[in-house]
């Protein structure tokens, strides 16, 4: 899939604005600029120019496009997404403002808050084919999981990051990091992403690599590399 793209979906809003958007259909856009239109609970978003993100509909559309495997990490401009998205309480009763959730939590309510975050869990919106995820709260919307990927309980995948598949992930894949096929991350291992301390270097791991348990890297790896445990 390539730009320009039109996304169709359902929006959840409150009196302060948009809380969440679930895009379920994509087609070619005929418009000449980025825009969105909301009619009731339906939303249509036009992504024509891949510019820094300026609104919530565009942010959610780009996150969906990556998790649907239409674009790989770093293929879309995700600049400014943190300034656009708001912190939301992701709960068993749907998304809500943290201040609203606070009023409902009294120790006896049935409200369960899964996270307070700008990004919801990916599987609330998208279930990619041929993957396993042991703890779905540890994969953010905007993660790219290729076929044959397994994310174990201690594995984590940030938005705009992911795996080509097949891969076994027991460590952390930070924003901007991409792991190529047949490479594995051991338990507790870390990859330094583009959100780490002002780091601008895009990190990738080549094919048939092993990042040992509790190891960490801040540089890219080529094919057939092994980083011993604890390094």
Protein language model annotation of sequence segments:
Residues 131, 137-139, 143-145, 149-151, ...:
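A structural motif detector for beta-strand N-caps
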Residues 1-127:
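Terminal amphipathic alpha-helical/low-complexity segments used for targeting or macromolecular assembly
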Residues 199:
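Core catalytic loop region at the nicotinamide-binding pocket of NAD(P)H-dependent oxidoreductases
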């Amino acid at each position: 899939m390539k730009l320009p793209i039109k996304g169709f979906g359902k929006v959840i809003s409150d009196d302060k604005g948009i809380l969440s958007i679930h895009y379920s259909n994509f087609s070619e856009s005929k418009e000449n600029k980025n825009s969105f239109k909301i009619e009731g609970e339906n939303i249509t978003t036009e992504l024509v120019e891949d510019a820094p993100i300026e609104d919530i509909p565009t942010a959610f559309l780009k996150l969906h496009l990556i998790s649907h495997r239409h674009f790989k990490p770093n293929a879309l401009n995700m600049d400014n997404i943190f300034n656009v998205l708001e912190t939301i309480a992701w709960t068993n009763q749907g998304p809500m403002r943290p201040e609203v959730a606070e009023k409902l939590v009294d120790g006896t309510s049935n409200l369960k808050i899964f996270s307070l975050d700008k990004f919801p869990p990916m599987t609330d919106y998208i279930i990619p084919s041929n993957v396993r995820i042991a703890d779905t709260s540890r994969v953010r919307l905007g993660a790219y999981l290729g076929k044959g990927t397994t994310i174990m309980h201690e594995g984590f995948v940030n938005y705009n990051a992911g795996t080509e598949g097949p891969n076994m992930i027991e460590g952390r894949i930070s924003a901007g990091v991409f792991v190529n096929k047949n490479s594995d991350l051991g338990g507790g291992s870390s990859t330094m992403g583009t959100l780490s301390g002002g780091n601008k270097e895009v990190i990738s791991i080549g094919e048939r690599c092993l990042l040992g348990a509790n190891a960490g890297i801040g540089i890219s790896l080529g094919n057939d590399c092994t980083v011993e445990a604890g390094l």
